[in-house]
């Protein structure tokens, strides 16, 4: 019998037999009901709130939490308070976060009996936070945003020196100063009533600030000068009411070679660092 004849015979036989076998993947009414029940059960699980963790688990988590999280967790409930206020738990924190206090409290009688480790760590964390909050913010401007203009005149002699901030290089612990080369202007040590001014300009001359303008009664190769107080600011990190312009002359024999300008604090007569100068200047150059 050929393959074609066999196929036709089999098809005819199936048509004559109404009780054919069901396929395993055939969707019956029973399967539909079962699928609906399973979907409903899954949906109920998705909308059911998870049960809170056991208090034993909470105690295991405690040693891995930071002091701030522990303090917040201890206020959630009575059970949480017992877990996260344990003296043994808080006692381990000084050694890892505040080594100075850890060394102090190990000494006999250093910690009063009434003082809990939780209170001790809370005070230490608060002190550290206050310290961080009192740190000055980064300046909004940089030296590359600024141009410094120094003007020196006496009688018919005059010198104008322009310094681009981008060309100035300072070390991390170096104090700010501007050096103006006036060697070719003919200023001599015996000159009287020498006028000096120091201007700062924001990029592309968007804003200008007259830092200092003064008249030096007599050039003297032995000493420097201080200008009047600089304009005050409301910047708590750099109080302009205590700042003065500092001028240091440099002579080559009797000829004025260079003039160095800086900003000094009149309380200790020390020049300011670069970032402090930028914080001061931004009060006048940036809205």
UniProtKB/Swiss-Prot annotation:
InterPro entries noted in UniProt: F-box-like_dom_sf, F-box_dom
Organism: Arabidopsis thaliana
Gene name tied to this protein: NSFBx
Domain spans labelled F-box: 50-101
Xref: PANTHER family: F-BOX ONLY PROTEIN 48-RELATED, OS01G0800800 PROTEIN
Name used for this protein in its record: Probable F-box protein At5g04010
Pfam families, A to Z: F-box (PF00646)
């Amino acid at each position: 019998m050929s393959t074609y004849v066999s196929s036709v015979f089999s098809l005819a036989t199936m048509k004559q037999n109404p009780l054919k076998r069901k396929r395993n993947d055939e969707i019956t009414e029973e399967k539909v009901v079962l699928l609906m029940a399973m979907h409903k059960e899954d949906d109920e699980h998705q909308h059911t709130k998870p049960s809170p963790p056991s208090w034993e688990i909470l105690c295991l988590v405690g040693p891995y939490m930071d002091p701030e999280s522990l303090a917040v967790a201890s206020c959630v409930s009575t059970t949480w308070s017992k877990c996260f206020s344990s003296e043994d738990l808080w006692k381990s924190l000084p050694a890892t976060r505040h080594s100075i206090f850890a060394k102090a409290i190990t000494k006999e009688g250093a910690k009063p009996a009434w003082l809990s480790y939780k209170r001790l760590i809370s005070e230490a964390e608060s002190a550290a936070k206050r310290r961080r909050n009192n740190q000055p913010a980064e300046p909004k401007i940089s030296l590359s945003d600024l141009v410094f203009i120094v003007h020196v005149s006496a009688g018919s002699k005059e010198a104008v020196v322009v310094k681009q901030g981008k060309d100035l290089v300072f070390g991390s612990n170096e104090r700010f100063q501007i050096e103006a080369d006036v060697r070719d202007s003919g200023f001599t040590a015996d000159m009287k009533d020498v006028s000096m001014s120091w201007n700062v300009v924001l990029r592309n001359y968007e804003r200008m600030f007259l830092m200092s303008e003064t008249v030096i009664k007599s050039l003297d190769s032995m000493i420097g000068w201080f200008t009047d107080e600089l304009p005050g600011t409301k910047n708590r990190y750099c109080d302009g009411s205590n700042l003065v312009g500092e001028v240091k002359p440099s002579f080559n024999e009797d000829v004025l070679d260079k003039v160095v300008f800086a900003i000094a604090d009149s309380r200790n007569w020390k020049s300011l660092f670069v970032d402090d100068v930028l914080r001061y200047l931004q009060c006048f150059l940036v809205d």
